């Protein structure tokens, strides 16, 4: 009935989702896989507790589902296990107006059948995706470990192009050779490579 209880005051409730839905965006795409568009990878992450967070708020800064465990450990004053991946988001929960606790998050996708031709009716797409997402920019590379699918890349300026219609990583884009765009692209490629070395461990083929 909505009446506060001691259990409610002692419980942190987290509402999340594992993926979004394309909903016919980007020219009629459906489902949620084989892409890094915001409709697919941007999901809610809501923390609720009347004592810890008496006032509502939201933050635009990057966060990942990997951050869930270290954040809960911090809120509960529990020492996280060594080597735990993810970032503590509790500073943002306590002060939504605070600056970012991390500059970017990485998204990965692995499908063991796409592009192999070994399974009937499989999606003819890259089996692996690696993406770096910052507050403003997003860069992704699509590839297949066995080289059966041509490598492709996407880059979007989410401030100027929130619907992700202008792929600045496509050689045919009129701004592809723009020095500022090229510099951002090289920076994002380097950041993604560093994140892959640090975080991503591909599944075996």
Where are these regions (language model features)?
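Histidine-centered active-site microenvironments of extracellular/periplasmic hydrolases
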Residues: 1-55, 64, 120
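Short, solvent-exposed turn/loop segments enriched in Gly/Ser/Thr/Pro and often Arg
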Residues: 17-20, 29, 85, 199-205
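Polar, surface-exposed loop/tail segments
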Residues: 3-14, 55-130, 183-187, 204-205
């Amino acid at each position: 009935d909505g009446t506060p209880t001691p259990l409610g005051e002692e419980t942190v409730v987290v509402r999340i989702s594992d993926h979004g839905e394309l909903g016919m965006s980007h020219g009629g795409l459906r489902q949620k896989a084989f892409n890094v568009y915001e409709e697919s990878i941007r999901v809610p992450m809501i923390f609720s507790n009347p004592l810890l967070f008496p006032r509502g708020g939201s933050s635009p800064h990057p966060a990942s589902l990997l951050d869930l465990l270290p954040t809960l450990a911090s809120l509960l004053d529990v020492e996280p296990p060594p080597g735990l991946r993810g970032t503590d988001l509790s500073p943002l929960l306590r002060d939504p107006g605070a600056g970012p606790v991390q500059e970017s998050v990485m998204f990965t996708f692995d499908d063991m059948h796409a592009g192999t031709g070994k399974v009937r009716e499989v999606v003819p797409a890259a089996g692996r995706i690696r993406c770096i997402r910052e507050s403003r920019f997003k860069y992704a590379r699509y590839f297949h470990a066995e080289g059966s699918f041509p490598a492709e890349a996407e880059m979007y300026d989410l401030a100027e192009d929130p619907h992700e219609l202008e792929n600045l990583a496509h050689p045919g884009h009129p701004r592809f050779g723009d020095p500022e765009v090229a510099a951002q692209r090289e920076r994002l490629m380097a950041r993604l490579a560093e994140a892959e070395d640090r975080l991503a461990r591909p599944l075996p083929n």
